[in-house]
C-alpha cells in the first residue's frame, strides 16, 4: 500500500520537489469516492442506473462486445478515447496503443490541447520545439506570456527568481492579473501588460513593426537562417503601435517600449504555455510569436528564444516504440487504421453508418483518462451520440 510519494532529487527540473497536484495523488487513491468495482448500466442510457458486478463478469462481457463489434463492422468501428489524465507517462504512453493497434482499432488524434502549440511554432521554426526552460536563468529579459508561472509551475519559478537576482527584468503579459503579475517589481523595471483576451497577435505584429522600423533586427542572422523576411516586413508595415493599441487596449507607448526592450535587452527569453492557444487563433499565436526571436537573432543566444513545455525531460524514460509496436497495426495484411480527431467526437458518434470512403461508423467507444462530456466541444452532440443504441 502506497503511503508516501517522493520526487527524484536527481531530476534536472523538479530536483525532487513534487507539485501540489502530485502531492495529493494518494488522497485520490484512498478516496472513499473512488470506484473499486465494475458497474454495469441497468437502466436507459443517461439515467445513471448501475449494478455492481464482478471483475470476471465485466471483463468477459467487454471482451464479448468488442469481439462482436470487430467481427460485424471491422476493427475501425472501435474507438479508444483518452487524453492526458493525470499526466503520468505510462497512463499517456502505456500499452493501450499496442493493445488496440493489434485489433486494428481507429487511432485518435489528440488535438484538443497542446498539439496546436507545436503546429503553430513549427510553421515558423520548422521543428515546433523551443529552448530549454531552465535556460531562462541566463536571460536578462523574461517575458511570461499567457502563463501564471508562479502558481502553476513552481519548479520553474526558482529559475526565474535566480535570473532576477542577477538583474533580469520580468514582463508578465496576461489578460488576467494573476499571482505572477502581482510578483512584478516596477522599481526594478518589471512590467505587467494586460491585453484584451485573444488580441496578443496584434501586439506581436506591432512589436515586429517597431523592431524593423527602428533597425533593431539582426540582419546577419536573418540572412543566414531565415526566409521570407521581405514578406514579413511588408505584412507588418501597417501594424503600428497605435493600431495595435486600438485592438488590444494596451497603450501604444507601452507596446513600443516593449518592442524596443525585447530587441535591445539581451538575451531575451519568452515563456508561454498552452493557455495562449485556447482560443480560435491559438496556432497563429505561436506562429507569430516565433518570428520575434527570429528578427532579433535571440534563437541563437543562450537564454534567448521561446520556452514551452518541459516534456523533453521525460522523453528518454520510456521506449515508446517498444511499447506501441506500430507494426501490429498492419499485422495480418491490414492497412494502417484511420486517425480520428478527438475534438470531433460529437460528429463521429452521430454518424454510425459512415460510407465506405471513410470507413465504418463507430460502434464502441472506450474512454479513460478524460471526460469528453466536460472537455470536448459540442457536448450536447456528444450526449446524443452516446445515447444512441
Q: Each predicted region: which residue ranges?
A:
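N-terminal export/assembly segments and adjacent metallocofactor-ligating motifs
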Residues: 1-214, 251, 335, 366-369
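Flexible, glycine/charged-enriched surface loops at secondary-structure junctions
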Residues: 73-77, 217-222, 269, 300-307
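A short, aliphatic-rich alpha-helical micro-motif
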Residues: 136-137, 186, 262-263, 359, ...
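Short, conserved loop/helix-junction motifs that constitute active-site signature segments
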Residues: 162-166, 384-389
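Internal, active-site/partner-interface "lid" segment
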Residues: 216-241
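Core structural elements
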Residues: 233, 256-267
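A glycine-rich, hydrophobic/aromatic-adjacent loop/helix-cap motif
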Residues: 262-358
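Flexible, glycine/threonine-enriched loop-and-boundary segments that flank and lead into catalytic domains
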Residues: 373-388
Amino acid at each position: 500500500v502506497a503511503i508516501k510519494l517522493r520526487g527524484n532529487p536527481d531530476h534536472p527540473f523538479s530536483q525532487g520537489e513534487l507539485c501540489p497536484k502530485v502531492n495529493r495523488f494518494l488522497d485520490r487513491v484512498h478516496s472513499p469516492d473512488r470506484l473499486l468495482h465494475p458497474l454495469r448500466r441497468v437502466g436507459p442510457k443517461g439515467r445513471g442506473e448501475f449494478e455492481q458486478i464482478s471483475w470476471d463478469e465485466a471483463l468477459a462481457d467487454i471482451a464479448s462486445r468488442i469481439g462482436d463489434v470487430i467481427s460485424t463492422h471491422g476493427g475501425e468501428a472501435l474507438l479508444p478515447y483518452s487524453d492526458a489524465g493525470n499526466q503520468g507517462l505510462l497512463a499517456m504512453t502505456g500499452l493501450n496503443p499496442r493493445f488496440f493497434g493489434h485489433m486494428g482499432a481507429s487511432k485518435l488524434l489528440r488535438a484538443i490541447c497542446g498539439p496546436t502549440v507545436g503546429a503553430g511554432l513549427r510553421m515558423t521554426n520548422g521543428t515546433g520545439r523551443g529552448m530549454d526552460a531552465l535556460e531562462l536563468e541566463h536571460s536578462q529579459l523574461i517575458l511570461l506570456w499567457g502563463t501564471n508561472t508562479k502558481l502553476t509551475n513552481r519548479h520553474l519559478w526558482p529559475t526565474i527568481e535566480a535570473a532576477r537576482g542577477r538583474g533580469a527584468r520580468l514582463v508578465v503579459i496576461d489578460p488576467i492579473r494573476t499571482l505572477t503579475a502581482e510578483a512584478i517589481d516596477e522599481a526594478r523595471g518589471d512590467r505587467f501588460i494586460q491585453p484584451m483576451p485573444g488580441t496578443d497577435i496584434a501586439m506581436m505584429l506591432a512589436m515586429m513593426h517597431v523592431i524593423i522600423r527602428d533597425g533593431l533586427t539582426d540582419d546577419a542572422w536573418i540572412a543566414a537562417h531565415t526566409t521570407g523576411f521581405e514578406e514579413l516586413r511588408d505584412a507588418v508595415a501597417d501594424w503600428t503601435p497605435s493600431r495595435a493599441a486600438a485592438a488590444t487596449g494596451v497603450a501604444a507607448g507601452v507596446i513600443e517600449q516593449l518592442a524596443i526592450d525585447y530587441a535591445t535587452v539581451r538575451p531575451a527569453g519568452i515563456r508561454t504555455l498552452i493557455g495562449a492557444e485556447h482560443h480560435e487563433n491559438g496556432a497563429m499565436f505561436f506562429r507569430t510569436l516565433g518570428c520575434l526571436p527570429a528578427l532579433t537573432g535571440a534563437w541563437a543566444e543562450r537564454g534567448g528564444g521561446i520556452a514551452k513545455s518541459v516534456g523533453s525531460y521525460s522523453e528518454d524514460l520510456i521506449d515508446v516504440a517498444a511499447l506501441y509496436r506500430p507494426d501490429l497495426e498492419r499485422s495480418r495484411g491490414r492497412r494502417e487504421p484511420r486517425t480520428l480527431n478527438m475534438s470531433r467526437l460529437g460528429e463521429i458518434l452521430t454518424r454510425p453508418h459512415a460510407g465506405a470512403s471513410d470507413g465504418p461508423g463507430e460502434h464502441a467507444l472506450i474512454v479513460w483518462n478524460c471526460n469528453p462530456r466536460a472537455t470536448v466541444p459540442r457536448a450536447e452532440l456528444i450526449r446524443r451520440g452516446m445515447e444512441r443504441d
